[in-house]
Amino acid sequence: GKTWKAYSLDLKTNKDELASAEAELHGFITDLNNLPTDTSDESIATIKAFYEKWFDMDFFLKTYAINILLGMDDDYWGNGNNYYLYFDTGKKGTGKLYFIPFDYDNTLGCSIHEGDFLQNPLEWGRGKNRPLMDRMLLVPEFKQKFVDYLYEVSAEEAAYEEPVYEE
């Protein structure tokens, strides 16, 4: 849909605070959609400030690197679904938004899309308009960290480390 009201909000916690949750989500989506799409220094600074305000960037980038490693294309970036946004902005919260993917039945080669494992991980969404990822990748620092995490989670030694057992 063209507006955020076209989508349903399935509040999982604090259900008595639906109105404020809707307002917070609306503000986030509006700000995200109004971010610049060019790569001027001023635009990059604006985009970076937005992401650093809303996200724990290391957590977000690591989450998406793991999503890609698992071949999770039935998600926000691929199909625009199967994720939660958790706003930890209450009195005792971190003030951050957490992106939480779910529904991993189409992973590890069980995808309806052939050759997902051959895709460039920086173009995972197959050209779809996904402002959350598109804007983030415009920031060189975030893009590089994302690539670094992709290498880190796919490194052979990361998958085959000997477990350490305490006696």
Q: In which residue ranges do the predicted regions lie?
A:
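C-terminal catalytic region of ATP-dependent kinase domains
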Residues: 12-15, 19-22, 33, 90-167
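Active-site acidic catalytic loop and adjacent metal/ATP-binding pocket
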Residues: 51-111
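Aromatic side chains
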Residues: 1, 7, 76, 83-86, ...
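Internal "kinase-insert"/substrate-recognition segments embedded within catalytic cores
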Residues: 1-70, 122, 156
